[in-house]
Amino acid sequence: MIKNFKRISLLIAISFICSKSYSQSDEEELPPPNILWISWEDVSQTFGCYGDTYAVTPNIDELAEDGIVYQNAYANSPICAPARSTLITGQYASSYGGQQMRVRSVPDREVRLFPQLLRKSGYYVTNDGKYDYQIVFDKDIPFDRESGGNYIWNNGNFRAPWNGRNGDQPFFSVINFTRTHEGHSSAINSGWEDKVEDLLGEKAHDPAEANVPPYLPDNRTTKECIALHHDNITYTDSLSGIILNKLEESGLAENTIVFFWGDHGWGLPRGKRWLYESGVKVPLVIRVPDKYKHLLRDGQKPGTKTDELVSFVDFAPTMLSLAGVSIPDYMQGQPFLGKHKKPPRDYVYVYRDRADETYDMMRGLVTKDYLYLRNYRPYLPYAQTIRTMERHPSMQDLREMHKADKLNEAQGKFFQYPKPVEELYDLENDPHNINNLAKNSNYEDELEKLRSRHLEWMKEINDVGLIPEPEFDMMKWPEGKGQRTGRPYFESEYRNYIDGKIEVSIQCPTSGASIVWKYAGSDSWHLYDDQPIVVGPNQILQAKASRLGFYTSKIATYQLGDPLTKTKDPSANHVPWQKKVNDQLINKILELKSLDYQKGDHLEAYYEYLDAEETPVRYWATMGIRNHSNTEKEISRARDKFMALTHDESPAVRIEAAHGLCKWGHYDVGRPVLRNALEHRQEAVRLYAMNVLDKMDEKPRMILPFPKIPLYTGGDYSHRIMCRIYKRLGIKPKDLEYATPDQVQNIRNTYNTIILDNLWDYNFK
């Protein structure tokens, strides 16, 4: 790989010695560097360059020999879409609602994705098709595949991502590899493991030699899964080598900064989706050509390792810093390379909320010495059921061994219930995060320091994860659906035609929107750059706009002779959610939730918050009372309160109250509340109710037949839970997992009680 890179680097180094070095003026005259991202899915630091002797990763290892290996690089979220959302915005996803899996968040109007800023500064920006940013609605954003033009990216060509640019135009290209994804490492007995072994030959991994972490059983199933995962890593390493060689063969390597990184930890149990090191610590290797070495930190040299703490929220400002572009104030990360680099950070912050169909809420922070975790829903077990995770053979094996009581203490921790409210781990002596020190008196000072810092951070960013997802969705879309960007309009300072032509500018009534335009009949949309556009006879100018998180506007048209009329912003009367979430609300919720870890019985304190005006406060208070009411007297008092709460204006509060009532045997009151929630127009309300039913074992039978409700369009998550419930109740499907839209419609025409895209032969009438 990179056959000539070292030789060329050596020649350049010699020439530098002869000429002493680049002067400051030379550095200022350098063109902006190209930047190439090579991202892999679901990988921890299981590479040769990180000291993993089981790994066969020659291409990434060689990249590391010429680059910097970051030993303390972290994804801020342990699951793909929230992690990528953080990457692309430079903001913590939990500050704008992107921390849940598969959501449509609405950032502030001023926010731009960093590739937009690079493109505006003159970069040619490409992405090979992996977006997953949790912000956009329509296919036009971020990439209009039909037109070839778009609001963010120039194109999405994988084979030659930097082709298509003008001359020496600098480029930023993203190439994503998916073979290491959790789904592929679970493909035991699918035929792929045999195919990849044939492809790798002697590089294939022997399961017997696999290194098994202490939190997983050291048995054949685990070893086979780890071996297949490493085979996929080696296979993807070869693909990465092809890209790097192509970069060199194009003559671009000496002008291109290369980032290799993984989107979060590996896909085995207790990795992906959890905030342990196995879930958030990722590989990061950065190669900077010698001519751009001034963009590194002082003392950084090729072929070295650094223990500097960096995280995904830092990537966006770092890209802008490397390109010499100003960093917007709204970005919450800090650049660690480039013109605007900041001193190394002391903390990395991590978060996890809903993972696929299953709710939880965890926050944490990492230093070089400790990992601190805060479980905001400690009454939930770690090992909740998540469909994708349950398909993994190692997860199936783990559950079987747990049922048979064959797990040791470290392995069985994954099934601990309830979870500890706080966790603290010594990273040097306990790299796998097994021994929780939170209740060890020797670490009280450290625990208090990290707890306080995590609370300060949540307040600094106004962490909206404290707001139940159904309530937050209603803050975003009171009418139950997203806002549409206003249709662009045209302006001109020249009312008289010049040579039969006119220059027009394009405006959008929705602030924060980006505009694209084209002439009618053209296949390509162009990003509008605020420069006038000439419209001549027989030409029709078309324009459309999109604000991040909004639907794309309707197309506007202009031709000579048309009146120049301003359009209106459809969202003008909509109060943005940012004005509904304030410091007072966040502080009040955190004050309430501090009862979780305070010593003593605080049941009475939860009641003090039950009549709060703020819906999220009432929600958390209801949950606290449900989980702390254990005696007959306590349950009797709570029952009376919860009866009244089933009429609360908030669906989330009603569902939580119904949860408690069903828990205490009052199905006659709880059941109608849950049934009504399943018919709610908001997807998140339905999913909240489904999560309650999923925790009830045989009790969901009390709610059958389920009402007919709309499909969950955000990722079929309600459908997944429905499938689990029916299977648990012994209802045998013909094909419970997959159904086409036509099959769904046919079934609905046959059975009035069928609700989601399921197929079965059971009559519920």
Predicted ranges, named:
Residues 613-614, 649-650, 681-682, 714-715, ...:
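Short inter-helical turns and helix N-cap capping residues of alpha-solenoid HEAT/ARM repeat scaffolds
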Residues 4, 23, 445-452, 465-597, ...:
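Short, compositionally stereotyped local motifs that mark structural "simplifiers"
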Residues 565-576, 598-611, 632-646, 667-677, ...:
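Amphipathic alpha-helical scaffolding segments comprising HEAT/armadillo-like alpha-solenoid repeats
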Residues 420-434, 461-462:
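C-terminal substrate/ligand-recognition segments
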Residues 2-9, 15, 21-417, 431-452, ...:
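Formylglycine-dependent sulfatase
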Residues 361-363, 423, 504, 531:
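Residue-level detector of beta-strand structural context in well-folded domains
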Residues 332-333, 464-473, 736-742:
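Short, flexible loop/turn segments with low-complexity composition
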Residues 582-600, 608, 616-633, 644, ...:
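Structural detector for internal amphipathic alpha-helices that build alpha-solenoid repeat scaffolds
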